[in-house]
Amino acid sequence: MGAWRNTRFIRSLSSVKRYRARFSYYSLFGGEPRACMAEKRSRSPLPAQRQIHVHNRQQEAQLLQSAKNVIPSLEETFHKGVAGRIGVIGGCQEYTGAPYFAAISALKTGADLSHVFCTSDSASVIKSYSPELIVHPLLDRTFAVNEISEWLSRLHCLVVGPGLGRNPTNLENAKRTIEKARKNKKHLVIDADGIAVVTTYPEIIKNYDSKKSKVILTPNVVEFDRLYTSVMGKAADPHGDSYEQARSLSQELGNVTICRKGQHDIITDGQTVVECSITGSNRRCGGQGDLLSGSMAVFLHWANIEVTQNPALVAAYAASGLTRWCNRLAYSRLKRSMTTSDMIQQIHQAFEELFGKE
């Protein structure tokens, strides 16, 4: 199987009204507005465009408004599946919680249907967590990719990685599923062990984006460093400019969108860099990234319908903000005993407070 190693913020938002939040900047972002913006000239072979490192609270609020605008109203004429059909590729004997968290978060964010494609020995456990998920015990089968491919035409977005594990068969099937998704022009959110797949085979997502399909990578700090080393051929400078490193990596991969998780999530498509500085809490329980990736898949589907420019940036920012707000609400009640299950219970309230919609 090979050696598996551990390995546009909208430049123009003229069509979007300025955000009029019910929250002050203090409550939303946890501090006074910072009015600093640094512009950089592109080193990309693409035509020169403004490079914006966003630390401006008003600019963040404007992006939040654009995220709000992509959320579809619930219409009487809708049928099941219109608001989103999401597939999660992951789940093995050791890790059954992660795919559940991602899939249930997609549903609670607003998707109509959520599928989990997992290994045969994890399917029963994942099914027992919720009757609302559609669980397919396929991932460890010899012809898994062919069977998963039959479902691709019915899905709007795939989340690859939650609970995938490091079994070579699972990793190989995840890799081939990404390749199939690319041929079928499907949106992708790649997280966790899916990042390990991309770290080993970065060519499978290089130049992935088109008008019909987008990909978002959601590495944490360690995963980002491994991916950076693999793609750039050198280690990331721990004292260097994190914004510039994220932008450079995105450019090298063909301007795919990266959401580098951290104290403040850094989001870039290689042309524009934005920061989500909405405050959560200092509690770092496992599984928060699964809530992020599941909700991000839904927003990516919505944004690609409503936004013609930088839909992946809008989706990544919306999901980042939602996850942080869930963390904040759950922590305010439970403090250090808070877990990701508690955060998921806050999705409804966080969604209403952050986006002003039911």
From Swiss-Prot:
GO terms for biological process: metabolite repair; nicotinamide nucleotide metabolic process. Its cofactor is Mg(2+). Keywords: ATP-binding, Lyase, NAD, NADP, Nucleotide-binding, Phosphoprotein. Its EC number is 4.2.1.93. PROSITE patterns: YJEF_C_3. GO terms for molecular function: ATP binding; ATP-dependent NAD(P)H-hydrate dehydratase activity. (6S)-NADPHX binds at residues 163, 220-226, 290. Transmembrane segments: none annotated. It catalyses: (6S)-NADHX + ATP = ADP + phosphate + NADH + H(+); (6S)-NADPHX + ATP = ADP + phosphate + NADPH + H(+). ATP binds at residues 261-265, 280-289. The keyword ATP-binding applies. Residues 63-354 form the YjeF C-terminal domain. CDD domains: YXKO-related. Catalyzes the dehydration of the S-form of NAD(P)HX at the expense of ATP, which is converted to ADP. Together with NAD(P)HX epimerase, which catalyzes the epimerization of the S- and R-forms, the enzyme allows the repair of both epimers of NAD(P)HX, a damaged form of NAD(P)H that is a result of enzymatic or heat-dependent hydration. Belongs to the NnrD/CARKD family. HAMAP family: NADHX_dehydratase. This is ATP-dependent (S)-NAD(P)H-hydrate dehydratase.
